[in-house]
Amino acid sequence: MASLRKTHPLLKIANDALVDLPAPSNISVWWNFGSLLGLCLAAQILTGLFLAMHYTSDITTAFSSVAHICRDVNYGWLIRNMHANGASFFFICIYLHIGRGLYYGSYLYKETWNVGVVLLLLVMMTAFVGYVLPWGQMSFWGATVITNLLSAVPYIGNSLVQWLWGGFSVDNATLTRFFAFHFLLPFIIAAMTMIHLIFLHETGSTNPAGLNSDAEKISFHPYFSYEDLLGFAMLLVALIALALFTPNLLGDPDNFTPANPLVTPPHIKPEWYFLFAYAILRSIPNKLGGVLALLFSILILMLVPILHTSKLRALTFRPLTQCLFWLLVADVMILTWIGGMPVEHPFIIIGQIASILYFTIFLFLLPTAGLAENKIFT
């Protein structure tokens, strides 16, 4: 008789995704980040739920409610630190996951890739509205600066900003709706993750060689389920270590000051995981141009499958494109550094060069290198 996990309508779905899933035998630790992102999402939803039980989304009490969570709620300080630093780990995993996809040609599964880009945008949006909730100085001014970018939209810009704010400035209405968005979006992300997985399981996973692995498949459980568990353990140890030893390492000191609309912080900057995009935004002197560059810096990922020119899938056997890939990684790191620097010489010009290089690599250098390698190989 067939086992229940193979016949039960619900268990069958879980079985096909987590137990009897055929996986390539040679996938490396770079294929662990999908499951780690699932763990991050679960941890964020769980800690966020407990924070929401004690948080108040009103400008008079928001800041002190966070202080109350840290001081008076049992293990509130731990839940808050896990949630704040969990966001950083979420983005570390997401960037490594995207980097893996770019390196090994996973983007050729177009549906999976495009759903992934939408997921990235949703996660970025969730992190942004979440950063506003503690109602510190950087929360308030970050919200003011970033939402103000919508005013660059021709004709309807100002109306759009006031509609988003719910008034003529970032105020109580803004905080309340941002809390609503921050509560809702993770569940939409969870649903989109399911769609991401459905598309992935239509084709199966890629592998480090970039070759067809149909002849050499092994079951997901126990081989990769245990490998994933090791990843879970390492991620949780790192997260708990950060949350316990240096919980404010990645935060901004300005956020220890309650929001004050009358005092602007000397350097307004987002959390570290948005700095590369912020640097691209700032590197263009025109407001609308900057906003478009900011949007395109993420949406350019959707063009990667279209711009794939090589006959080979992965970069494993493509030394020229490998160099460009690592140049891109270095460039994103430089942009991240520049995004956290004041707008003055020499940071302005470095940011502009790095921004131009970022788009040039994606739109011109990678496709050209692919064509050149085709010539070399034939």
Swiss-Prot record:
Its cofactor is heme b. It comes from the Eukaryota. GO terms for biological process: mitochondrial electron transport, ubiquinol to cytochrome c. Gene3D superfamilies: Cytochrome Bc1 Complex, Chain C. One of its GO terms (molecular function) is metal ion binding. Heme b b562 binds at residues 83, 182. A ubiquinone binds at residue 201. Binds 2 heme b groups non-covalently. The keyword Transmembrane applies. One of its GO terms (cellular component) is respiratory chain complex III. Keywords: Electron transport, Heme, Iron, Membrane, Metal-binding, Mitochondrion, Mitochondrion inner membrane, Respiratory chain, Transmembrane, Transmembrane helix, Transport, Ubiquinone. The chain crosses the membrane at residues 33-53, 77-98, 113-133, 178-198, 226-246, 288-308, 320-340, 347-367. It is a multi-pass membrane protein. Heme b b566 binds at residues 97, 196. It is found in: Mitochondrion inner membrane. The cytochrome bc1 complex contains 3 respiratory subunits (MT-CYB, CYC1 and UQCRFS1), 2 core proteins (UQCRC1 and UQCRC2) and probably 6 low-molecular weight proteins. Component of the ubiquinol-cytochrome c reductase complex (complex III or cytochrome b-c1 complex) that is part of the mitochondrial respiratory chain. The b-c1 complex mediates electron transfer from ubiquinol to cytochrome c. Contributes to the generation of a proton gradient across the mitochondrial membrane that is then used for ATP synthesis. PANTHER family: CYTOCHROME B. Heme 1 (or BL or b562) is low-potential and absorbs at about 562 nm, and heme 2 (or BH or b566) is high-potential and absorbs at about 566 nm. Belongs to the cytochrome b family. This is Cytochrome b. The lineage of its organism: Eukaryota, Metazoa, Chordata, Craniata, Vertebrata.
